[in-house]
UniProtKB/Swiss-Prot annotation:
InterPro entries: AlgH-like (IPR003774). GO terms for cellular component: cytosol. NCBIfam families: PRK00228.1-1 (NF001266), PRK00228.1-2 (NF001267). This is UPF0301 protein Rpic_0619. Signal peptide: none annotated. Belongs to the UPF0301 (AlgH) family.
């Protein structure tokens, strides 16, 4: 019989940081899990906008953003790994060269062609751009979950793309029927 850890797959789930999260990097975050397997896990923080918008970022990478309503869209802190690199989470299209398909209809793309398409008015209809990602080695995430570091729930793309970033934490908890004020940082306490 397989161990319980062998059966867990958090791909297309939200990780919701518990109040007692020991790592301040992830305090108050919601992480969308793009990949989780026996080698480890990769996700993107979806509720931590940084002080840069798409127009500014596109200028830095020599792209002219033709769609003005997108110019003020926030760029997000995706996690502490490779923070100089962009990761685009978007509705699945199958059109870009370096994309990871995620069950549930989303893709994570790391190639510049998706940004070029967005700059020219094409590209995915719904997307968020993060700098960096959250990564865990084999067994690390499972250990954090067992120590009450994270709650998990099936992801809802509407929260990623249509809920304001400051409301995504509460919206993700609401998927579990939890009011954020009712959480305790200690296991076994309400």
């Amino acid at each position: 019989m397989a161990s319980p850890d062998a059966l867990i797959n958090l791909t297309n789930q939200f990780l919701i940081a518990m109040p007692g999260m020991a790592d301040s990097t992830f305090s108050g975050t919601v992480v969308y899990m793009c990949e989780h397997n026996e080698r480890g896990a990769l996700g993107l923080v979806i509720n931590r906008p940084i002080d840069i918008d798409l127009a500014t970022l596109f200028d830095k990478i020599d792209l002219k953003l033709e769609i003005h309503p997108l110019a003020e869209q926030s760029v997000y802190y995706g996690g502490p790994v490779q923070t100089e690199r962009g990761f685009v989470l978007h509705d699945a299209t199958g059109a870009y060269s370096s994309s990871l398909a995620v069950p549930g209809g989303l893709e994570m793309t790391t190639s510049k062609d998706v940004l070029e398409a967005v700059a020219q008015g094409g590209g995915p209809h719904r997307f968020i751009l993060t700098l960096g990602y959250a990564g865990w080695s084999a067994g690390q995430l499972e250990d954090e979950i067992s120590r009450n570091g994270w709650l998990t729930v099936q992801a809802d793309p509407e929260i990623i793309f249509n809920v304001p970033p400051e409301e995504r934490f509460a919206a993700a908890l609401n998927l579990l029927g939890i009011n954020p004020a009712m959480l305790s940082g200690e296991a076994g306490h309400a």
